[in-house]
UniProtKB/Swiss-Prot annotation:
Record-linked SUPFAM superfamilies: Calcium-dependent phosphotriesterase
Gene3D superfamilies: TolB, C-terminal domain
A Pfam short name: SGL
Protein name, per record: Lactonohydrolase oryL
This protein's UniProt keywords: Hydrolase, Signal
Domain of life: Eukaryota
Gene: oryL
EC number: 3.1.1.-
Signal peptide interval: 1-27
InterPro entries the UniProt entry points to: 6-blade_b-propeller_TolB-like, Oryzine_lactonohydrolase, SGL
Cystine pairings recorded for this chain: none
Protein source organism: Aspergillus oryzae (strain ATCC 42149 / RIB 40)
Protein family per UniProt: Belongs to the SMP-30/CGR1 family.
GO MF, one annotated term: hydrolase activity
Entry function: Lactonohydrolase; part of the gene cluster that mediates the biosynthesis of oryzines, natural products with an unusual maleidride backbone. The two subunits of the fungal fatty acid synthase oryfasA and oryfasB probably form octenoic acid. This fatty acid is most likely activated by the acyl-CoA ligase oryP to give octenyl-CoA before the citrate synthase-like protein oryE catalyzes condensation with oxaloacetate to form tricarboxylic acid.
Length: 436
């Protein structure tokens, strides 16, 4: 969750082929070495953006050689605005006449051979709902009711937002849990219950006291239950995201974003970190504290790898003497726009072999899921990126709003719902998520 809240508070590159050059052998000291030169102007030698076989253009656009060489002069102007940063397609490349076609593309294809199965025969991106122009989080599909739950990060806002997928077109409503859940940012469905990570903290909101932590919500009865709300007496700062392993242990991130999002009255008491919680025994153990702002978390399909997103490019003021806390400050040059992979120890009690796998091409990677094939799917800026498990980009989905979190939905989990700042989109394609 890399949040944007001001409106809510008012309401409460392609490659050109180089020309072949024959290198001249050194037959004498005077023989010059002929080095090929990168062309700086003129018409492109290759087409940077083109149609993808079997798909309509420019809705689906293939980018030559990952866009690694742009002809002539080009510039991507940095826009360090939280929730509205610069994008790949905002790059100005006047010597690449096809680059502007990306403005009208729904899908950018980096790897054409992999994209065919990812996109399926008839991919679509549909803008479904216009919502408040602030952060929305914690999307999760409930197969027992065929609904998609998500939350709004607005000071004092307690209902859950629910999309009813039984209706055509789907409809959006509010449901208030008992007791309410405040500012959920991560969610999973297991064994009939929603497991929610929350960043909301307040001593007297609607007659309740809220603390960041882990909670369950029964979507049938609307009843909630607290699972975890402290680390040996310390409040958590902002329990942001979670996943549940095949043994039932809950792994979750805790960052500094609750107070600058204006949904937590307390400044951080402990450092940002990632934890493992055993709901059977109550034991909570830190497993990593190396990320600036640990955010999204997901397991690989075989549960042997954990992927974490670091959104430390969005920094928070943690000084309790500064009140109210300023909003999160985003800067693209700050470390923390990265997805990391870790091996899960055989004991399933620790994380090993941390390595970076992806530096976001837009904004910072926030919510993250894995597909059945093991692809990484992450909310990044104005869209969603699909990566190999080693971080190679395959496909990017473009949206008209900043996406903060995502969830697979539908009976076959072949729809991806993207939730974010001001909008909700549905992506229908060939990629499928896990049933768990």
């Amino acid at each position: 969750m890399l949040s944007y809240t001001s409106h809510c508070l008012q309401a409460l590159l392609g490659v050109a082929s180089l020309p072949y050059r024959q290198y001249q052998a050194y037959s004498s000291p005077q023989a010059p070495l002929q080095v090929p030169q990168v062309p700086q102007a003129g018409p492109p030698i290759t087409t940077l953006v083109s149609s993808c076989a079997g798909f309509s253009y420019p809705e689906v656009a293939c980018i030559d050689r990952y866009g690694s060489l742009l002809q002539g002069e080009f510039e991507r102007k940095v826009r360090n605005v939280l929730g509205d940063a610069d994008t790949y397609i905002s790059t100005n490349a006047p010597s690449e006449p096809t680059f502007s076609d990306l403005q009208n593309a729904d899908f950018l294809v980096w790897n054409q051979s992999a994209a065919k199965a990812i996109l399926g025969p008839n991919p679509h991106v549909d803008f479904m709902f216009s919502i408040e122009d602030c952060s929305h989080e914690a999307p999760v599909y409930v197969p027992t009711t065929n609904e998609l739950y998500f939350s709004r990060l607005q000071q004092g806002f307690l209902p859950q937002l629910v999309i009813n997928l039984n209706n055509d077109p789907p409809t959006l409503e509010e449901k208030l849990a008992q007791p309410p859940i405040y500012a959920a940012t991560g969610a999973r469905f297991r064994d009939g219950l929603l497991y929610l990570a929350t960043i909301g903290g307040n001593e007297s909101l609607a007659g309740y006291t809220f603390r960041p932590g882990l909670y369950t919500l029964d979507p049938i009865t609307g009843k909630t239950q607290a699972l975890l709300n402290n680390y040996y007496g310390y409040y958590f700062n902002a329990v942001d995201d979670l996943d549940i392993d095949h043994e039932g242990q809950i792994w979750f991130t805790d960052n500094d974003y609750g107070r600058p999002c204006q949904v937590n009255t307390y400044a951080p008491q402990i450092n940002a970190a990632t934890y493992r919680f055993n709901p059977k025994t109550g034991l909570v153990t830190m497993v990593d504290d190396t990320l600036l702002e640990p955010n999204g978390l997901t397991f690989s399909p075989d549960n042997k790898t954990v992927y974490l997103t670091d959104t430390g490019a969005g920094s928070a003021i943690i000084d309790p003497n500064i009140y109210p806390a300023p909003h999160i400050a985003y800067n693209s040059t700050r470390k923390g726009r990265t997805i990391y992979a870790y091996d899960v120890a055989p004991s399933r009690k620790a994380l090993l072999n941390k390595r970076p796998v992806y530096l976001s091409m837009e904004y910072a990677p926030d919510g993250i899921k894995t597909s059945r094939e093991g692809y990484l799917v992450s909310a990044t800026g104005k869209g969603v990126v699909v990566l190999t498990d080693e971080g190679e980009p395959l496909v990017r989905v473009q949206t008209n709003f900043t996406v903060i979190n995502i969830a697979f939905a539908g009976a076959e989990r072949d729809e991806l719902w993207a939730i974010g700042k001001g909008g909700v989109a549905r992506i229908r394609w060939g990629l499928k998520g896990s049933y768990a």
